[in-house]
């Protein structure tokens, strides 16, 4: 009897092991997995950046040569070292597969697909720009190997629509991702590509994304922020797994405004979730709980849940907020690591309206800078009196802007700007104003509270080119603490005309002439709530004007100037944290 029982246990254990397969978690408009690849979706070997081309245009479906995986990796629990890709939209670890790939797609599992394959099946490389590329992102131990299907044509719609999508292998986790990046159309004859997304272990076992083989791509921008991805995990899917994706707790909150806390929750378990508990805690205090029932949250479904007890802050200052779920369907969550999201926010008593600081990197030799400046002007004109502008004329492309100075170079390095046009908004990373910045983006920045009043009391120009100005800072909160805060000041010229070059612009606005006292600003200390501090700043321009031939022939700030009209000067001041750049 004992032997029979042991044999029965062995059978159960074997059955459990055999039941393991891939399951997936879908993330829509979530960016790229892990955030390692921040490149434009259309980046390839042609535009640099370390991509390796496996194959280009191919009239008929073919395989690439096999490629080594750059780190240890397992597929379905077994080590694999190489892969190859098919121009019809999949990769396979069965590098010995010889059957000619078919364009497809078909439902998974399919005898037409090799064993051990990852599928974005349903494309071709018939176009002149089509191709498959690879690149490794990240550092040892936490790398991702990307296999990108670049500008792939849609079967039956050659020349009208293209897809950019990738298969991603992740070091350490052995997770596999399918990333849908970008979809383009040429004209109204566009036919939406249809794909079979999933992983096929063999001709009888597969994990297929719901809707395959008829998943259609949404048209999207060529930026990672709007990408969709599917995360495939090998193992037994949890039955109960409620993952908290995000919450609505803002970075800044008025102490007098009760906040109704909400959380976006995704069901990553196999069982439908009908009820759970939503919790929050402030500064490690007692949990505030709410029962949420009446749910029909299926696998990979997302719902925004609302807590029934609003939070009214008891005091101003920094607060640590934790939001989490528990007890899905009355039982323990089997993956507690994804149950919680946290935030550190500032609760304030008083705030001032914000003027959004725009530092614009441009050049008169940069063709896209002209429409970029036009786009910015349209936003500024629509929101008068709520912004400040400072423009840095750069030393590239080509010979660069003749009004480039070494101080522009310092600011460009500070913000890590490597292309123009680029607009830095309140210290945030530069964006291309040609489609990368909208009135809605502006409004979001302007809605952020400001915790200091900054006032230029006097600004005077003497006939000898000396500019004197007095500035007062009045903190409204004890927010600006530490040694990283700076008073940044600049003298700019409202309109210049003589730095015309090759991009078609004939006049330039708010051109920075001198940072005062330097690009490093004035160090601030001992800032206290309600206590004004006053600063006297001054700069005398040299009396020698010179128009450089190129940016390489830049002026010497100690002995020369590019000011065209001293009576057209303006002063710009702003507060900045040197560490966070805000």
Descriptions of predicted regions:
Residues 1-23, 237-239:
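Bacterial Sec-dependent N-terminal signal peptides
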Residues 282, 320-337, 575-577:
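Enriched for extracellular/lumenal, surface-exposed ectodomains of secreted and cell-surface proteins
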Residues 385-582:
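Short, conserved sequence motifs used for protein processing/export or organelle targeting and
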Residues 234-243, 443-451:
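Proline/serine/threonine-rich low-complexity linkers at boundaries of modular beta-sandwich domains
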Residues 251-258, 461-465:
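Short, solvent-exposed loop/linker segments at the N-terminal edge
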